[in-house]
Amino acid sequence: GLIDVRCYASRECWEPCRKVTGSGQAKCQNNQCRCY
C-alpha cells in the first residue's frame, strides 16, 4: 500500500519499501510511494 514517503522516481521507493514490507517492489504514484 501507500507509505508516507514522497518521491519523483520509483527507485526512490525501493529502500523505504524494503524497510516496511521486506520487499523491494515499489512504484512512485502521484508523488507518493506505493509498496507491493
Swiss-Prot record:
The record marks 27 as: Basic residue of the functional dyad. Keywords: Calcium-activated potassium channel impairing toxin, Disulfide bond, Ion channel impairing toxin, Neurotoxin, Potassium channel impairing toxin, Secreted, Toxin. It is found in: Secreted. Pfam families: Toxin_2. One of its GO terms (cellular component) is extracellular region. Expressed by the venom gland. Its main location: secreted. The record marks 36 as: Aromatic residue of the functional dyad. Disulfide bonds join 7-28, 13-33, 17-35. Has the structural arrangement of an alpha-helix connected to a beta-sheet by disulfide bonds (CSalpha/beta). This is Potassium channel toxin alpha-KTx 16.9.
